Amino acid sequence: MKRNAMAVSMLLLAAMLFNAACSAGSGAGTTAAKNESGSQSAAENSGMDSAHPIKVAVAAPMTGDNSEYGIGFANAAKLMAKKWNENGGCLGREVQIVEYDDKNSSEEATTIAQKIVSEKDEIAGVIGHFSSGVCMTAAPIYEENHVIEISPSASHPDYSSIGDYIFRNNTVISKEGGASVDIAVNDLGKKKIGIISIMTDWGTNTSGIIKGILEGMKDKGVELVAHEEVMEGSDDYSAAIAKLNDAGAEAVICCGMYNLVAPVAKQYKRVNPDIAIIAFSNAYSTQLLELGGDAVNGVCFPVIFFADSEEQSIKDYVDAYTKAYGAAPSALSSQAYDSVGMLLTAIQNVGDTDSEKVKDELYKLDYHGVTGDTRFDKTGDVDKAFVKVTIKDGKFVKMD
């Protein structure tokens, strides 16, 4: 349907080479920690079969620089499993979440993927991995062995085309990039746009997409005035900010996560308090508010999950997540939550954990979750409506 052997092999090679340079560190071994989402007594009291559970793997960085994303995936997955277990499980069987720490490393992800496929009779599917490059390293292994992978965060356009068993519950970066530019130009009325991006696969790809979009808007008087690439995790972006400011940027699109957006906002507003800053959904988190303080007021994002929605199901989810883990869920964690829900719903619908049947059902599924209405297209991608969000008085609110 979506692949040929040569294409898969080339993508695997490219991803492994690229991630050797840009991954966040590989670590010495593979960590797999099992976490049962419901207690034994809960399983017994509900009449669920806990001796033959349905296991869902969550493979993501549980340690290292990006651990908050992997931990968020796992927390959300356990919350969804708990919801199913409180209602009798899936096919009458207890749902269990099994965590694998890939450290956002291609090498670790390869080892983990090989371990998971060796146990595929016990694993119903994989939620993960986090970064696009790591996902694209592991995906051919899952595809070849007919193991379903749903990434809540991969945004590289080529990821889902690796195979029929490969899905993403995240928008392709070209669509989110277009939404970010739309905020800068049409909502905020800015014409002179700057870009600051992290020197990673995602940062390079995203900034390139933004450049292409801006190039196509020249006839509307929109121009890219400067683009600065920076190291992820740096404490000092003053040199890049000075160049963007000297170039006359009215708005800056930050191609990075909260640990880029927060310090850029702090340092830029010392130079130019009126600068407009636009970020992406991977920066939409409580960590941004904590790290950025007053400086992130006015930062804008396009997101497909808004924690302060008036929809009751979202309120219930946010309350349950906050009660369990002490903070509101991020957009990406919420996409992991829905990813588990879609996988379990497909299993329930076909009455079996056979991966071919479940895969076919996922392509047919219409799922209403906390991140909106989801339906996979023929390549395993989703198309969702964005909510435009900004920060006001230290809180996320919908843009006027």
Residue ranges of predicted features:
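In a subset of proteins, long, contiguous C-terminal domains/tails are tracked
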Residues: 11-14, 399-400
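Extracytosolic ligand-binding ectodomains
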Residues: 2-4, 23-400
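C-terminal motif of bacterial Sec signal peptides marking the signal peptidase cleavage site
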Residues: 18-21
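Positively charged n-region of N-terminal signal peptides that target proteins for export
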Residues: 1-7, 11-12
